[in-house]
């Protein structure tokens, strides 16, 4: 069962979460993933890529193989660990490689669909 299926079946009977406590093993907040310029720019790129992917999927112009391949790359890019390495609060000493790997996944979404690479 997928989360969407579950919500269709039980969504009306679920309680509303009024407050979501931010937590991680690192700090009890979202600061390591959002807020700094580099982090926010990466989220913007991810968001735009997801929008473009969803539009491509709905268009019916792409094969199942193209959509599935692009979706795999999309899911890999949506892993929260990418955002750990952005900003000044974390330093791997090789942040450039994490940035390139993240952006390569986003590029592969477009390339899997036969679209032009974005300019990032």
Where are these regions (language model features)?
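Active-site and substrate-binding clefts of carbohydrate-active enzymes
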Residues: 1-120
């Amino acid at each position: 069962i997928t989360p969407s299926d579950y919500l269709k079946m039980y969504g009306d009977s679920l309680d509303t979460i009024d407050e979501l406590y931010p937590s991680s093993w690192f700090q009890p907040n979202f600061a390591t993933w959002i807020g700094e310029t580099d982090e926010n720019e990466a989220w913007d790129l991810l968001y735009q890529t997801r929008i473009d992917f969803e539009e491509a999927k709905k268009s019916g112009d792409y094969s199942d193989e193209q959509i599935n391949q692009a979706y795999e790359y999309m899911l890999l890019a949506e892993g929260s660990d990418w955002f750990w390495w952005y900003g000044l609060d974390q330093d791997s000493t090789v942040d450039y490689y994490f940035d390139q790997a993240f952006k390569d996944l986003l590029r592969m979404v477009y390339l899997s669909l036969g679209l032009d690479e974005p300019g990032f």
